[in-house]
Amino acid sequence: MSRKNSKKLKVYYLPVTLTQFQKDLSEILISLHAKSFKASIIGEPQADAVNKPSGLPAGPETHPYPTLSQRQLTYIFDSNIRAIANHPSLLVDHYMPRQLLRMEPTESSIAGSHKFQVLNQLINSICFRDREGSPNEVIKCAIIAHSIKELDLLEGLILGKKFRTKRLSGTSLYNEKHKFPNLPTVDSTINKDGTPNSVSSTSSNSNSTSYTGYSKDDYDYSVKRNLKKRKINTDDWLFLATTKHLKHDQYLLANYDIDMIISFDPMLEVELPALQVLRNNANKDIPIIKLLVQNSPDHYLLDSEIKNSSVKSSHLSNNGHVDDSQEYEEIKSSLLYFLQARNAPVNNCEIDYIKLVKCCLEGKDCNNILPVLDLITLDEASKDSSDSGFWQPQLTKLQYSSTELPLWDGPLDIKTYQTELMHRAVIRLRDIQDEYAKGTVPLYEKRLNETQRQNQLDEIKNSVGLTFKKKQEVEKSINDSEKRLKHAMTESTKLQNKINHLLKNRQELENFNKLPSNTISSENHLEEGSALADKLKEYIDKNATLFNKLKELQQANAEKSKLNDELRSKYQIESSKAAESAQTLKILQESMKSLENEVNGPLTKFSTESLKKELERLQNDFQSLKARNKFLKNYITLMNRQYDLKNKNNVQVEKAAANGTRFRSTRSNTPNYT
């Protein structure tokens, strides 16, 4: 949270925490420095004998180094704690290969440091911001680090992102050949109108071409160069520098028109000449975002400044320590507070980084976005440094290993210190690797069981699919059988009706075939013949009746067919007329719609509104003229009534008539004759 603002420089402190890996490395450092730091706090003299704890491989010292004093160990302790708070890789003193930094993935580089995670979110918020609502099209941001090694880690994080980078301190990991355009400068040899200065022209080389009064041909005949100039790059700029370089070069950032500063060094002083030059040249507010680890030694030293206290502590320099008693006491106090508060719970503050970046770029106050950054209040149990458990390292608990760090008891030289630090870090790394290996075994078993369960589930799904497919096939065959049965029943009914009709005809034919035999008497024969003749005549009459009826039906059918043809032709004519009418109606509707659009369109509305306004203006003018006319009439009437002008004119006319002279009542350019 911002606690200190100066003219055009707004400082905001962004709280960060420590990862579990950083906490374990801090506990390893505590195990090495606990005895010496406790002795320095109590004021005990430094021990001379070297008592190595059990577990350290003993060996002859071929290259003896001077023993480190309590003050030196305290400075080393403070420096290493600050390095771990920034990134665990900074604890390593040897050279880091550039190829490794270029190839390291972003996830692995930021996994061990919460500061790097916050920085990654900040630069992503800058890169993927809403450019339409952003006041600046291209953002120029400066990132200030403690050292060159930290700057290498930062550049490895930035590589591959949509930024143009410029390394101001140290050598770049990968030269992307980004060139920052030079700011326009005022040339003293050229006047404002483009003509050369007389003083400078006289002092110029005599071989140079003299000024002819015509403007110089500025046309660039290189097509390739023109095409390059036309390409506008809208990527943002990131400038990488260190605090040391910023202290020694006050014009380091003066020529880049910086919009924002992100400082990894929370002890960066706003009163530095480089920042003062940047403040004086800027015509805008420049926000400075400092990443500060909560409850760290830096937080303890900056607490008075964050709370806007008038008391200012002497801040530490990143390069070398001045042997000052007040500074040394402040270091011990900050480290003691870090030891007391290292196990206190820290709230993870949820910050909207996109909103924070937008607020900073717009020059607004961001205090309401950032949380309050105060030191935690310690209880008496946490402040009690006399307890042995206070100095005991408390590593993150592992499930499959329980390695304890013994406290180093005895003097240390720089070689022994580095060896022991590496030895304990390697032991912790092996424990973590074993924890990972043993922890992945049940995970693999669960993964295998889940795979088998998924395979069984797939088999069940396959069997369900096959069963469902067979069910559909059976249902289809049943439906087909039902349809065939229905069709067969219909055909059977038809055939049964035909059989009944044929049986009836057969019965009639059998009755006709029953003729009388020759043995029958003639009388019987005549009776049978007359009966047969009567029946035949009946059938003939019935056939004739049916034939006449059929003929009538055919004639009626022919008339209906003729009438149907006439109606069909009439229907075709009417339908064609209806189609033409529908087409005409459609055309009329489209034309009507277009006319409505024209009437309701902006052009017609604009002209109508303008005419309405003109009519309203003319009506207002007419009313004003009417009122003015009425006023003048009333005024004339009033004047005539007050001064009796009509009577005076009449008197003058009468006097003139009596005297025999001429009188002109109206004004004229011609002279009056009296």
UniProtKB/Swiss-Prot annotation:
Entry's Gene Ontology BP terms: chromatin organization; negative regulation of transcription by RNA polymerase II; regulation of transcription by RNA polymerase II; regulatory ncRNA-mediated gene silencing
What's a single GO MF annotation on this record?
Answer: DNA binding
Asked whether the UniProt record includes Transcription regulation among its keywords, one would answer yes
Renumbered to this chain, the Polar residues biased-composition regions fall at 185-196
Q: Does the keyword Transcription apply?
A: yes
The protein's job, in short, is: Required for activity of HDA1 histone deacetylase complex. The HDA1 histone deacetylase complex is responsible for the deacetylation of lysine residues on the N-terminal part of the core histones (H2A, H2B, H3 and H4). Histone deacetylation gives a tag for epigenetic repression and plays an important role in transcriptional regulation, cell cycle progression and developmental events.
* Name this protein carries in UniProt: HDA1 complex subunit 2
Q: Which organism is it from?
A: Saccharomyces cerevisiae (strain ATCC 204508 / S288c)
